[in-house]
Each structure stands twice: as structure tokens, then as C-alpha cells.
Amino acid sequence: LFWVENGILFFEYKPDVILNLNVAKKVVADRIRFQNEKSYPVLCDIRGIIDTDKSGRDYLAHSGSMLTKAVGLIVHQKVSITISNFYLHVSKPTVPTRLFTSKEDAIDFLKQYQ
């Protein structure tokens, strides 16, 4: 689910998603098509992801950054935060990327990239 509000692109994963390479490629292709060649700061709610694999994470860290100015990831569990922090340090996304448990904090971070 994608929408733009106040210059920020919002994206929410559906519940119980297993993020593998095929899912990552589809999500990125759908987002790029939705954006119609315009770059945005992106708020991505990943609370619906229940599992990932390395190829999916790597794809998002690199190809998933196309047409993004910065990314705020919304997480809700300590396990998600730990895994996501590990992802940020190992995969090294190509745009500024931070984790948040609060949507408002993520929006504040992304406003500087509008």
C-alpha cells in the first residue's frame, strides 16, 4: 500500500510477509511505478514482515534505494529493532536510513529530505 502525504511517500507491508528476493523485487518495482520517476523521502512500515532472507535484504539495501531521498523504517518489536539495526550495519543502504518505533519521529526525520 503506497500513498504520498506532505511530500513523503508512505508504504506499509501487508501482515505476515516473508521478504525474499522475489517479494523485494516486486515491492521495489511497484513503488517505482507508483512514484512515476519522482524521488521522495520514504516512510516504510515493516511491522508486517515476519521473516526475511539475505538476498531480499541485500536487494532492498541497494536497488530498493532507487528514487528515495531517505528512508524511515517503522518497527514495533525489540527483535525487529535488533534485526533491523544489524541489517543497517551489514547491508549499508545507499541513502540515509533510520529505525523508529514512532511514526511521528520517522516523519520528523524525513522532513529534512523533502
Label each region the model flagged.
Residues 1-114:
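Amphipathic, Lys/Arg-enriched alpha-helical "gate/interface" segment within cytosolic domains
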